[in-house]
């Protein structure tokens, strides 16, 4: 069967959307788009306009108010009412989207709209709601990688989406067999924010035809935009909810409004439960018969992270209360339909102020409980239940309690909340790419067999803690972590947590790290945190210290490292600072290893945390919660969460995964074996060699299709290498995998050269190439130790007296530059080469290499600006002003740019603007580090 062309796919979709209820209209350019918008605006506001449609002046006045805004501001205008002054000085309010009666909006569809701004573009399918282009569909023919459609959207958005196209809320991309949707934003569009649509049972709806049938029906689409897109006020971005979040909210609302029963939602850790539960709370708080919605969290969870998250979804959602009287006032305030508080504070309010809350014995109240397995097993829940007689309770959890892992009183989650309203399990989340799978290692630290703390088959008198914490074993584990940490964390690009069995163990490990760290060329940044008891049991004098003393030392070490001023009197502030620190990326000063007992193992999210070291016993929900700290999606260089167990937790891991994925097949959750990846590598390597037998033959490829085949083949190989490197048995040798590291570096250099070539061609020419939208996944190629700082360190070590040694240093730098994969370093490559070839040989031992390089860069930058300005006949100082603005804002000032270019013919003006924007962006990156 011949493949379906892009044109045929587009035509098929247009026909289907027409059948679903969209009016098919012909809109070919921006003028027709504005005319159509104006017509519908007049129709929808006929009553308010009283038979007098908007005049040209009035419409122009409106466009001035709504045009030229950011995507974020446009999204707010779309959902708001806008006052418009008429020519007779009267005022009317215009609305652009009916966010409550979704079906009352006007739905149209058009295709092949042409726009011409900096670049020409023609869009595939545009969905108009009330005349505004709110959804843009970009299609690729079957067999083309869907990421190419994503990259095309990124290109269009950067180059073409202006005017009313700033109101696009959502993009849909498809190649016919695979379909995704994602929200529009001012900031960089991320692949991790592309979502699959699915049915209520989490079965993926992939084909474009099925997707349109389920997702794109007019009322459903308006509902998605109105109800299930969130305006994140803190980050100033639009967020689209995922299908399982939508279904959970719908099920909960139905249960709350149509029955008097309780229920719970089981969504795996890391799947965005906070957003789901908050959205449900928000919608329920708008119901007339529900007097109050109370969002309950556990005390330890209402930290800065939770407050931050809630306030993102609705500004001012969390009014932090420091005493129960404030909470009582909030409960009695009818203007506050939604309250966020802790279970502990609520129980206290009832105990001391029950007479002030009498109305709640009859008023309907809905409690939404986040992470209900932590906060709802206990006396406080019973106390709240006794007072709020007409209340419904809805729990959210990632790890429910079942008979095998029930609470201390034997109750399960179902015993407390009743029916499970919706599930989204860890296997579903991994399949959809919403969380990562796990790579789990078990390191045996005993010669005979792995010992378990509860293992009584050993000699009965054995002191198991003494065995686990024997000096020799603690040092063995610590050395293993030190020796492998860089490999596990991709040269410290990521952070890690080390969880141990007790405070005593934490202190011992911290002190061992501190001692061994002194011998390292690049010491690890290790921090520790725990909660001490004021009156501690000294275990019959066995422990010769109070744990507070040891924590004080850890905090003092931390203060020296990070220039802070914490103490054991300010442990909350210390906790919050550590929390932010573990979330920092590679370029920031950060913690490499955080040692904990239980803290940070639940409810803590950090995308840059990828490794968990374990030296304690974990089971069921505790195990899954701890493992899940590592599996937040970040970028291509983080393919899984790495778990390193120093105890034999194989059975516990399998049992936990079986319970929480509801399957005996754990292969979808755990990484495959080394041998499987090795076989996959050999097949991919063979395929690469068939396309280009040697790296230098890449230079001979003339055909773009062939070059694309090379890029795709090497990209696949690089992905497999990334996974192989996680295994201890991996060796990058010909004997082991048929390829050595040098050959891989040579292929990688050619791959990056193609990337540079495409990037340069895209910036310089208005030319469409099949390589323009290919996904190079550059982050995956990076080796974060080989960057600009690394090269500068080598430069500083150049021996300026010994010329022979100097030549060796220069040659070393040249070799490194030839294989550079850091983007900034690749930009500086020619500069550094010129510096070591022309400047270094003339230096003497008294010269400061750092200062000499700064001077050299300054001269080169000055020459580059002078040359570009002269070549283009533009003002050099004005160019520098634009560059300085860009350095701080990341945006080329359009007013300054327009003034600089002056009056040129349209085509020349477009060409000049593009050249200046490219020059400013590249020189800023090149000279900015």
Swiss-Prot record:
For this protein, the record's CDD domains field holds: DEXHc_RE_I_HsdR, HsdR_N, SF2_C_EcoR124I-like
Q: What is its EC number?
A: 3.1.21.3
PROSITE patterns noted in UniProt: HELICASE_ATP_BIND_1
SMART domains, sorted: DEXDc (SM00487)
Enzyme class, one word?
A: hydrolase
Reaction catalysed?
Answer: Endonucleolytic cleavage of DNA to give random double-stranded fragments with terminal 5'-phosphates, ATP is simultaneously hydrolyzed
The UniProt record lists the keyword Transmembrane: no
Which GO molecular function terms does the record list?
Answer: ATP binding; DNA binding; type I site-specific deoxyribonuclease activity
Q: Which residues form a coiled coil?
A: none
Alphabetical keyword list: ATP-binding, DNA-binding, Endonuclease, Hydrolase, Nuclease, Nucleotide-binding, Restriction system
Q: Name one Pfam family in it.
A: T1R_D3-like
By sequence similarity, the record places it as follows: Belongs to the HsdR family.
The miscellaneous annotation reads:
Type I restriction and modification enzymes are complex, multifunctional systems which require ATP, S-adenosyl methionine and magnesium as cofactors and, in addition to their endonucleolytic and methylase activities, are potent DNA-dependent ATPases.
The identity of this protein, by name, is: Type I restriction enzyme SauMRSORF196P endonuclease subunit
Species of origin reads: Staphylococcus aureus (strain MRSA252)
User: Lineage in the entry?
Assistant: Bacteria, Bacillati, Bacillota, Bacilli, Bacillales
């Amino acid at each position: 069967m011949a493949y379906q062309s892009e044109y045929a796919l587009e035509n098929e979709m247009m026909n289907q959307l027409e059948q679903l209820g969209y009016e098919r209209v012909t809109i070919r350019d921006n003028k027709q788009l504005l005319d159509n918008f104006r017509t519908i605006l007049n129709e929808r506001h006929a009553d308010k306009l009283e038979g007098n449609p908007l005049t040209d002046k009035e419409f122009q006045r409106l466009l001035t108010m709504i045009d030229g805004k950011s995507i974020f501001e446009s999204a707010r205008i779309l959902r708001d009412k806008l006052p418009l002054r008429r020519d007779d000085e009267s005022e009317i309010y215009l609305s652009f989207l009916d966010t409550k009666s979704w079906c009352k909006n006007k739905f149209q569809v058009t295709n092949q709209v042409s726009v011409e701004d900096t670049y020409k573009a023609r869009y595939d399918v545009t969905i108009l709601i009330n005349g505004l282009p709110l959804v843009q569909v970009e299609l690729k023919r079957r067999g083309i990688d869907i990421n190419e459609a994503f990259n095309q959207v990124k290109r269009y958005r950067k180059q073409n989406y202006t005017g009313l196209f700033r109101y696009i809320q959502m993009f849909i991309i498809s190649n016919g067999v695979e379909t995704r949707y994602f929200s529009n934003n001012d900031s960089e569009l991320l692949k991790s924010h592309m979502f699959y649509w699915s049915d209520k049972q989490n079965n993926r709806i992939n084909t474009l035809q099925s997707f349109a049938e389920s997702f794109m029906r007019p009322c459903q689409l308006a509902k998605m935009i109105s109800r299930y897109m969130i305006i994140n006020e803190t980050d100033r971005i639009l967020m689209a909810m995922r299908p399982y979040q939508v279904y959970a909210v719908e099920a909960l609302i139905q249960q709350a409004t149509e029955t008097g029963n309780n229920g719970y939602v089981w969504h795996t850790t890391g799947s965005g439960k906070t957003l789901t539960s908050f959205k449900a709370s928000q919608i329920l708080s708008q119901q007339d018969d529900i007097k109050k919605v109370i969002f309950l969290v556990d005390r330890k969870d209402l930290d800065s992270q939770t407050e931050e998250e809630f306030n993102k979804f609705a500004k001012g959602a969390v009014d932090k209360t420091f005493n129960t009287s404030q909470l009582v006032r909030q409960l009695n305030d009818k203007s506050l339909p939604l309250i966020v508080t802790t279970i502990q504070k609520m129980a206290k309010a009832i105990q001391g102020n029950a007479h002030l809350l009498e109305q709640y014995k009859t008023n309907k109240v809905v409690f939404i409980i986040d992470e209900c397995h932590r906060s709802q097993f206990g006396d406080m829940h019973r106390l709240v239940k006794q007072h709020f007689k007409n209340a419904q309770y809805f729990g959210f959890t990632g790890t429910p309690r079942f008979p095998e892992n029930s609470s201390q009183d034997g109750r399960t989650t179902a015993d407390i909340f009743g029916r499970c309203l919706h599930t989204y399990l860890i296997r579903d989340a991994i399949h959809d790419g919403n969380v990562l799978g796990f790579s789990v290692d078990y390191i045996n630290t005993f010669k005979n067999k792995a010992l378990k703390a509860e293992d009584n088959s050993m000699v009965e008198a054995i002191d198991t803690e003494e065995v686990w914490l024997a000096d020799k074993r603690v040092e063995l584990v610590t050395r293993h972590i030190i020796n492998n940490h860089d490999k596990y964390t991709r040269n410290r690009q990521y952070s890690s947590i080390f969880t141990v069995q007790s405070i005593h163990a934490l202190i011992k490990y911290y002190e061992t790290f501190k001692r061994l760290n002194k011998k390292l060329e690049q010491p690890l940044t290790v921090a520790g945190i725990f909660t001490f008891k004021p009156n501690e049991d000294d275990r019959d004098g066995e422990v010769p210290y109070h744990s507070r003393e040891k924590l004080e030392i850890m905090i003092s070490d931390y203060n020296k490292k990070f220039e802070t001023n914490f103490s054991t009197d300010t442990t909350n502030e210390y906790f919050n600072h550590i929390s932010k620190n573990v979330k920092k990326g590679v370029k920031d000063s950060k913690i490499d290893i955080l040692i904990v007992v239980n803290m940070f193992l639940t409810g803590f999210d950090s995308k840059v945390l990828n490794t968990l070291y374990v030296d304690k016993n974990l089971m069921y929900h505790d195990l899954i919660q701890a493992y899940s700290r590592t599996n937040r999606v970040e970028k291509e260089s983080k393919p899984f969460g790495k778990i390193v167990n120093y105890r034999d937790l194989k059975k516990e891991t399998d049992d936990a995964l079986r319970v929480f994925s509801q399957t005996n097949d754990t292969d979808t959750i755990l990484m495959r074996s080394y041998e499987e990846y090795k076989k996959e590598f050999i097949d991919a390597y063979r395929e690469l060699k068939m396309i280009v037998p040697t790296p230098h033959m890449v230079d001979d490829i003339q055909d773009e299709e062939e070059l694309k085949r090379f890029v795709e083949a090497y990209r696949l190989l690089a992905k497999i290498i990334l996974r192989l490197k996680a295994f201890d048995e991996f060796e990058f040798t010909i004997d082991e995998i048929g390829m050595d590291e040098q050959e891989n570096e040579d292929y990688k250099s050619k791959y990056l050269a193609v990337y540079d070539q495409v990037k340069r061609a895209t910036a310089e020419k208005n030319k469409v190439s099949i390589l323009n939208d290919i996904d190079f996944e550059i982050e995956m190629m990076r080796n974060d130790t080989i960057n600009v700082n690394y090269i500068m360190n080598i430069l500083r070590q150049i021996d300026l007296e010994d010329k022979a040694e100097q030549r060796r240093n220069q040659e070393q730098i040249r070799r490194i530059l030839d294989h550079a994969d850091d983007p900034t370093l690749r930009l500086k490559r020619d500069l550094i080469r010129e510096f070591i070839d022309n400047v270094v040989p003339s230096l003497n031992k008294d010269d400061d290499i750092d200062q000499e390089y700064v001077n050299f860069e300054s001269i080169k930058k000055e020459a580059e600006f002078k040359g570009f300005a002269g070549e283009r006949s533009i003002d050099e100082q004005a160019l520098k002003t634009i560059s300085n603005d860009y350095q701080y804002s990341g945006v080329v000032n359009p007013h300054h740019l327009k003034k600089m270019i002056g009056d040129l013919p349209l085509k020349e003006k477009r060409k000049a603007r593009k050249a200046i924007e490219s020059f400013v962006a590249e020189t800023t990156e090149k000279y900015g580090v």
